[in-house]
Curated annotation (Swiss-Prot):
NCBIfam families: PRK05022.1 (NF003451). The keyword Ribonucleoprotein does not apply. This is Anaerobic nitric oxide reductase transcription regulator NorR. HAMAP family: NorR.
Amino acid sequence: MSFSVDVLANIAIELQRGIGHQDRFQRLITTLRQVLECDASALLRYDSRQFIPLAIDGLAKDVLGRRFALEGHPRLEAIARAGDVVRFPADSELPDPYDGLIPGQESLKVHACVGLPLFAGQNLIGALTLDGMQPDQFDVFSNEELRLIAALAAGALSNALLIEQLESQNMLPGDAASFEAVKQTQMIGLSPGMTQLKKEIEIVAASDLNVLISGETGTGKELVAKAIHEASPRAVNPLVYLNCAALPESVAESELFGHVKGAFTGAISNRSGKFEMADNGTLFLDEIGELSLALQAKLLRVLQYGDIQRVGDDRSLRVDVRVLAATNRDLREEVLAGRFRADLFHRLSVFPLSVPPLRERGDDVILLAGYFCEQCRLRLGLSRVVLSAGARNLLQHYNFPGNVRELEHAIHRAVVLARATRSGDEVILEAQHFAFPEVTLPPPEVAAVPVVKQNLREATEAFQRETIRQALAQNHHNWAACARMLETDVANLHRLAKRLGLKD
């Protein structure tokens, strides 16, 4: 089989039709799956010796949340090391990273696999993977044809990554000679709430404003702080963390501002506080609402004037610190109740960010579950950890009062339980491996029995007509591709279409 000019043109057109990078990547993967007639396809980004899924088709949704480290996936490592098309034979001893991740076929192993490394110049930036359930599924495509596909995908991915770098560094196009990967904390999620949060992080990171991060316990406020710091001009300097809720009142001031020798019993030497440690960098104050009013007043002075005093010292020290604060309390209510200073609240909340709870993030719970499954797989040395359909359904209908942290612990516990109930190094998580209280699952949908208003011939023709229409739409009105999809002769398909009134 050879790719026609029309097929390549259709792929190029799909790359231009999307509004954003994510949409374009998804169009590319969906089109490739149709053209190559594979069971699953994926576009992966390469970063720090791991592949990060950007778009998938034919794979379980939790794949988008997984991070495939090369040391745990020998096939992906082989693709990363190769400079060309990689074909894995059906009897390859290297496990496929997608085994058990094709919906409806969790217990079956992937047979055919092709990997296409994607390059920008000499730099590996990603990969295309094609998987099928038949051993010889991709034998009809030559390496040259697959290289053409890889070139189109590499161009799209390279442009997207370069634009991302330019936007994050606020550079002019003429300032960038080549793409360089920018390490950033991975915030997993594609829900509207998380998409908006990521946009706001990009906006505020480039500034030097103080940020107040609010959200329920376990939503990931510390990850937000890390993402802001890593995308800021201060990223080369330290990010210092302090949990205000864990500070005894007797040592809180010393922890923040430091002390000199002899300032109090036990002060046997000079000691720098968190503000000094974070000089020219960022200080993250977690659970800021737990600070006493006296300490709030001293913190306010630092934010106003940029100087600190160590405990027991009359001298002031200048510091240049950006403060990111987080809380699970409603600080406006705390201000009204007199437990938090209004002036400090306004100083901190120059640019407030709100992290959505997991119950409001839709399918993000499945992406995060995939991420934690992959973490457990690596940590426990398992060959695969996958979610059954029942487990995914359960996770989507539990409200997670403990948010992402509760999900993480639930996945880890479920993996341990599932591993104990079966031999081998493959784990499939079932609903019974989770101990969620009072989860009400929706009743299974019962299809309504239609009232028969047609005779058998009319009903058959109506079904054939609709099936052909759908196949044509999926194959861009390519009759040959439609015939292959329906597993019929193209001439017979033309005759049937004429009889059904679909062709003149």
